[in-house]
């Protein structure tokens, strides 16, 4: 019933109009599992390799026909005839087939597409939701959404250095209420921007992307929008930042160049900057506040801010257990951002989450800036009781698909579902 009978990959488009890979896994019972792989704009240097064709005459070199070929010609023959319920074994076979530490041979996009589609086919065959298949009977916690309502950095074409300004509806009682609160703030933010004569075009993840005089002005405008929506900053709503500092770090000079503000800072000065913002605004989480290789700077930031706010490693850890292990040993950061395509298989993703939780780190399940209608990350967030999800603004179908899936999951869980709000920050003083 759960034996794989066929595997097929094709090239499709993501939300930025770039090619990505879709994989279909068919079982002997006729069941189909289908998955589409996302793609990032600000990518960590230590991420698994996303295989692109490089043929400038086709999709400006961004085609993925080679990855598609690797699935159809190399991976498919090896896993056809295997049981889709053997997720760990199938993922291991693909890792062995690739044989490189960063999936450079077959491509993380090829491997992940198959890994996700196998899991979906298995869940479908058992007639249970994906979150329940991956997480078992204890998968019950709906995540607090980190809603990216204002964009800068490489996710937008403006002069704001910080990549994402997010609201977290920690005061909600249910996920449904949290989504409503965040959405109302988003619409009020549009009105606030209009009233100031600022642009209301959106970035890759659906957040607004106006030109502002400073990074702090973005926070001030969001505070206005929260109050205009009738909510109390710091009580109903907390703020989160994704700085993506690697994007403006000068490796040679060891300096952070915030070109939007026309200033240059050392790691210590960046931490001073964050400390001042945290004192002034209800910021509960800062992601990638320093460069992915500035381990000493990260240690200082964790030492100074880690008791009071969530310090999230994205480019720092790239969902990789080896880099996470180093972070745990050196007391660097206190939270990990989890992106499936940074590491490339369901199994390795779950391993990273387990390692983080055992060390007392919080986990944030995340989308990529180049997304699709695939909502797998919504199921994974509930499967592992992550407590937090980052999947953009309540706009653009590629983002809303994940929120709508979480609404469905909340309905499926009924009274057993939990939304714990502020309690997701279990390792800091709230």
Curated annotation (Swiss-Prot):
This protein's GO CC annotations: cell surface; extracellular region; phosphopyruvate hydratase complex
Gene name, Swiss-Prot/TrEMBL: eno
Q: Which GO terms describe its biological process?
A: glycolytic process
Please explain the role this protein plays, according to its UniProt record. Answer: Catalyzes the reversible conversion of 2-phosphoglycerate (2-PG) into phosphoenolpyruvate (PEP). It is essential for the degradation of carbohydrates via glycolysis.
**Enzyme class name:** lyase
User: Any binding details for the cofactor?
Assistant: Binds a second Mg(2+) ion via substrate during catalysis.
The molecule here is called Enolase
* TM regions (residue ranges): none
User: What does the record list as coiled-coil region(s)?
Assistant: none
Q: Name one GO molecular function term.
A: phosphopyruvate hydratase activity
Q: Which cofactor does it need?
A: Mg(2+)
Return the similarity comment: Belongs to the enolase family.
Keywords of the record, alphabetical order, are: Cytoplasm, Glycolysis, Lyase, Magnesium, Metal-binding, Secreted
Its recorded reaction(s) are: (2R)-2-phosphoglycerate = phosphoenolpyruvate + H2O
Pathway per its UniProt entry is: Carbohydrate degradation; glycolysis; pyruvate from D-glyceraldehyde 3-phosphate: step 4/5
**Which residues make up the binding site for Mg(2+)?**
242, 287, 314
Q: Where in the cell is it found?
A: Cytoplasm; Secreted; Cell surface
Q: Where does (2R)-2-phosphoglycerate bind?
A: 163, 339, 368-369, 390
Pfam family membership, one? Enolase_N
> Which Enzyme Commission number(s) are listed?
4.2.1.11
Q: Which residues form the active site?
A: 205 (proton donor), 339 (proton acceptor)
């Amino acid at each position: 019933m759960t034996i794989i009978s066929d595997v097929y990959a094709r090239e499709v488009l993501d939300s930025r109009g770039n090619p990505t890979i879709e994989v279909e896994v068919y079982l002997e019972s006729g069941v189909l599992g289908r998955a589409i792989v996302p793609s990032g704009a600000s990518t960590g240097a230590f991420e698994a390799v996303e295989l692109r064709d490089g043929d400038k005459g086709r999709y400006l070199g961004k085609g993925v026909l080679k990855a598609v070929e690797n699935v159809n010609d190399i991976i498919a023959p090896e896993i056809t005839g295997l049981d889709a319920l053997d997720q760990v074994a199938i993922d291991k076979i693909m890792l062995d087939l690739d044989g490189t530490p960063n999936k450079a041979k077959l491509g993380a996009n090829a491997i992940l597409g198959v890994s996700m589609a196998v899991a979906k086919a298995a869940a479908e065959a058992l007639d249970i939701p994906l979150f329940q298949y991956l997480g078992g009977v204890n998968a019950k916690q709906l995540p607090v959404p980190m809603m990216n309502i204002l964009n800068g950095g490489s996710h937008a074409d403006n002069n704001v250095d910080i990549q994402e300004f997010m609201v977290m509806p920690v005061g909600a009682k249910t996920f449904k209420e949290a989504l409503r609160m965040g959405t109302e703030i988003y619409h009020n933010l549009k009105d606030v921007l209009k009233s100031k004569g600022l642009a209301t075009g959106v970035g890759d993840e659906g957040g607004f992307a106006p030109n502002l005089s400073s990074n702090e002005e973005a926070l001030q405008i969001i505070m206005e929008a929260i109050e205009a929506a009738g909510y109390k900053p710091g009580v109903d709503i907390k703020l989160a930042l994704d700085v993506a500092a690697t994007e403006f770090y000068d490796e040679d000079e060891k300096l952070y160049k915030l070109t939007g503000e026309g200033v240059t800072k050392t790691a210590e000065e960046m931490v001073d900057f964050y400390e001042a913002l945290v004192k002034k605004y209800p910021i509960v989480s800062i992601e990638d506040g320093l460069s992915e290789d500035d381990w000493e700077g990260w240690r200082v930031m964790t030492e100074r801010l880690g008791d009071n706010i969530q310090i999230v490693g994205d480019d720092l850890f790239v969902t990789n257990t080896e880099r996470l292990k180093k972070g745990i040993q050196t007391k660097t950061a206190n939270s990990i951002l989890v992106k499936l395509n940074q590491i490339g298989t369901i199994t390795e993703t779950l391993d990273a989450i387990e390692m983080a939780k055992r060390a007392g780190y919080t986990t944030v399940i995340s989308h990529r800036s180049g997304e699709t209608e695939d909502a797998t990350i919504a199921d994974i967030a509930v499967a592992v009781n992550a407590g937090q999800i980052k999947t953009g603004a309540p706009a653009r179908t590629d983002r809303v698909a994940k929120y709508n899936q979480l609404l469905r999951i909340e309905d499926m869980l009924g009274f057993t579902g939990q939304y714990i709000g502020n309690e997701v920050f279990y390792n800091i003083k709230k």
